Amino acid sequence: MSNTWDDVWASDSDVETERSPDLLKLRENHSKRGYLDGIVSSKEEKLQEGFNDGFPTGAKLGKQVGIIMGILLGLRTRFGDEDEGLSKAYIDAQKELRINKVLSKSIFDPNFDLQEKHPLITKWTDIVNTYCEKYHVPSIQ
C-alpha cells in the first residue's frame, strides 16, 4: 500500500488518471520554474566568472586602443589638413579598432588568453609611432 504523502506530486501511474488538470498545470509550472531558476543561476555564475577572468585583458586592450586613437586624433587635428594619409589612417583606425574586432575570438587561444602581442594593437602602434616620428611628437612606448 502506497502512502499518498510519499510523493507530493502523486506521480505514481495509478494515481495519474485521478489528477485534476489544475494540479497537472501546477506541477508543470513548478518544474519549468525550477529548471529556469537553475539555468539562470548557472548563467549568472559563469557570466560573472567570465567577466572576472576577461576584464583585466579587456581593460588593458581598451586602454591601448584609447591611447592610439587619442594620439591619432591629436595628430589629425593638428596636421590632417596637410596630410591626407594621416586623415585616412585615423578613419581606418576607427574601423579596425572597434571593440568587436579587438576582442574577436580569433585573436585569443581556446582559454581566451593572448598568446603574443595583439596584432591590431601592434599594427596601429607602429603606424602611430611612424606619424609621431614624422611630426616630432613623443611616440607610444
Swiss-Prot record:
Coiled coil, from the record: none
Residue ranges of the region described as deca-GX3 motif: 34-74
GO biological process: protein maturation
PANTHER family the record matches: PROTEIN YAE1 HOMOLOG (PTHR18829:SF0)
Pfam families, sorted: Yae1_N
Swiss-Prot/TrEMBL keywords: Cytoplasm, Nucleus
Main location: cytoplasm
Subcellular location(s) per record: Cytoplasm; Nucleus
Gene Ontology cellular component list: cytoplasm; nucleus
Database matches in InterPro entries: Essential_protein_Yae1_N, Yae1-like
Function: The complex LTO1:YAE1 may function as a target specific adapter that probably recruits apo-RPLI1 to the cytosolic iron-sulfur protein assembly (CIA) complex machinery. May be required for biogenesis of the large ribosomal subunit and initiation of translation.
Name the UniProt record assigns to this protein: Protein YAE1
Superkingdom per UniProt: Eukaryota
Family to which this protein belongs: Belongs to the YAE1 family.
Subunit structure, interactors included: May form a complex with LTO1.
